[in-house]
Regions:
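Alpha-helical transmembrane segments and their immediate juxtamembrane interface regions
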Residues: 103-144, 205-241
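Short, strongly hydrophobic alpha-helical membrane anchors
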Residues: 1-15
Length: 241
């Protein structure tokens, strides 16, 4: 056995096999649901697909308006959500990095919690690093959503006078498709960040035991599925004209 293979086996022994299985279930649940939701939205009206339809209708209405101040205010209000979450995520990441600096004391504190699994400081650090990685991903998605809303504001700012559309020099439908798609992409990025927040709650279960980690992952995926495809607000939006 060469040195590389030996090191690989040594890395695998850092975590017990139940923890490795729980990690695999976590990533399959997260990535798998993201792929499933995207493909399902193409054939079935999900919450995101339905709101994208309304975004396109909104952009189509802007082509008829002479004064578009209200539209600019709406875009600004929409961009405040990813901005708030991005700022909050930075604070969370900072707190988690601070925990890494006192991992031994934190690991001892976690051991005193009822039903919490007794682990070494190294394993505790790995759990904190995973949680930190989840929030780092969320931060990137929130900031990208914020930038995309900025791009959407630019598209609206470059919108010609409504008389240009009336004369047939530009197509209302093409503009609505383009601008609505930009707004939809911003919403999708924001949705990815929120999904990461949900998955972070599943990671918290890992501090108790691998079983709670798996149960938390399954529970979060179920909640995400119900809200995206079977929520009350989706039924209302789909029933609206």
């Amino acid at each position: 056995m060469d040195l590389t293979a030996f090191k690989s086996l040594k890395i695998l022994t850092v975590l017990p096999w139940p923890d490795w299985l729980a990690l695999i279930v976590f990533f399959i649940g997260w990535v798998g649901y993201a792929v499933f939701a995207r493909r399902r939205s193409a054939s079935s009206m999900s919450l995101l697909a339905t709101t994208n339809h309304y975004r396109r209708l909104w952009m189509l209405q802007t082509t008829w308006r002479d004064v578009r101040v209200v539209d600019g205010v709406i875009v600004q209000n929409l961009s405040t959500s990813p901005s708030f979450f991005a700022s909050t995520t930075i604070l969370i990441i900072g707190g988690l990095l601070a925990v890494l600096g006192t991992s031994e004391k934190a690991a001892v504190l976690v051991k005193e919690i009822p039903f919490a699994a007794a682990t070494s400081a190294l394993v505790f650090d790995l759990k904190v690093l995973l949680l930190t990685g989840v929030f780092v991903y969320a931060f990137f998605r929130f900031t990208w959503s914020l930038r995309q809303y900025t791009f959407g504001a630019l598209v609206m700012g470059a919108l010609p006078d409504f008389r240009v559309f009336e004369r047939g020099e530009l197509s209302r439908e093409e503009y609505a498709d383009r601008a609505g798609r930009v707004m939809g992409l911003a919403a999708e990025s924001f949705n990815d960040g929120l999904r990461a927040y949900y998955m972070a709650f599943a990671v918290i279960g890992w501090f108790f035991s691998p079983l709670w980690f798996v149960v938390g992952t399954a529970g979060v995926v179920y909640v995400l599925y119900q809200r995206e495809f079977h929520s009350d607000v989706l039924a209302v939006l789909k029933s609206s004209p």
